[in-house]
């Protein structure tokens, strides 16, 4: 059960990462996977979240949909969200702020890897941060309901 659940979460994170929601300004689109990843961490815990995230990154690498730079950025986001979860637990504060913190850390990692444009990257990421903050709680509620339904049916 645990192995299948982790694999399904990995696929959910990987597939949702392919969906881009356009922003108002060109270059400000964002991935649907951010609020989903926050919800996965909040509902299933850091261990299952980080394993599913690593598997999702490996899927992206093996399918050719991402490269090592993408994986470094993804892992920065995941570690930021995970650290926030470890500090605050699964509460409304976590769901609202962990995604933007993870995104900011991912942009900081890009800045250190590329050496340019931290302020512009953070500005471009702002709509996605707002979307993640606004929707992660709803995804968390959905995942909690699904998780409870699966546990009671076994």
Q: In which residue ranges do the predicted regions lie?
A:
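Loop-helix junctions at membrane interfaces
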Residues: 1-154
